């Protein structure tokens, strides 16, 4: 396919997904589809609604805004409570969808969105923390920091503190990124480990460093986008902190680029083991890289020369994994369904573990980031 054909196909693909989805039954949430359980407020839908709202902002097409509002309104009540969401679960994943409430509040001015924003914020006020001050990823994972959690919570946290709390928590957010750099960055590769256990008690944690054993692509992707999204919401008056996160972002992109597959432009599921049996070129993390870089270049956080790396990743992913079925339906493959650390399934962070998780099509953890990258590609035209 030509680049123009790919962009057209992606537009059709998004329309196909929203035409076949609702808040009760989003076809892109494969975990929910497989479980057969009713849908809940969750980060996976949050990724897709963020992408739809970004499409609205870029194209002006009202159908994306209308779909997003209807989806969110299924959960958000007039008093600001959110159906199926419990702040006391202390799960950072559940904060992600909250970013979209700011957008809807700005557009529609409905106070229920403002109240729901405070509902989400109430979780972060009492979210358990490590001794150094980082949010625990979940209450059920004590003392643990995962890269995923930076994307799930920090952009919301930074936006709330900047808008409504006189920037009181902004330096706290910055310090959490610096703690992650101190503990989770590998000096040799520049990559960041998926998880860190401050207590050093988990079976997956290195007894000296507390880190998990490997560099999972999607976790790195979440982390890169988190830095871009936090910078976007951060006041430049915080001179040292703003430039500190920008420097961390630039260095991370430089380091990650070294692991980009030369032929396809994609990245491997476990980043530093290319071609190892069981490893594969993975869609979601590659798309997150493309989005982070394209957005970072557009907003001036990254040098323009990096955009070529992102475009190669974007088109490489589409060439390899985006296709049209004989019945006319569209499909995006190569998406790791899920990966975590600990829990009842003994997720030990090994190569074998990351290679064992299901690879699926049309899941929002891959679709959402690719559509976000697509909106950046449109903006470059």
Residue ranges and their predicted role:
Residues 2-44, 63-65, 74-92, 96-98, ...:
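CBM-like carbohydrate-recognition segments
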Residues 7-26, 66-83, 115-134, 167-203, ...:
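Long, well-ordered core segments of solenoidal/helical folds
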Residues 51, 58, 100, 107, ...:
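Core register positions within helices of long alpha-helical scaffolds
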Residues 59, 108, 160-171, 230-243, ...:
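Inter-helical turn/loop segments and adjacent helix faces that build the functional surface
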Residues 76-83, 134-139, 199-213, 268-278, ...:
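Acidic/His metal-coordination segments adjacent to aromatic residues that form catalytic metal sites
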Residues 148-163:
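Acidic/serine-rich, low-complexity amphipathic helices located in mid- to C-terminal regulatory regions
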Residues 224-274, 278:
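Oxyanion-binding "anion nests"
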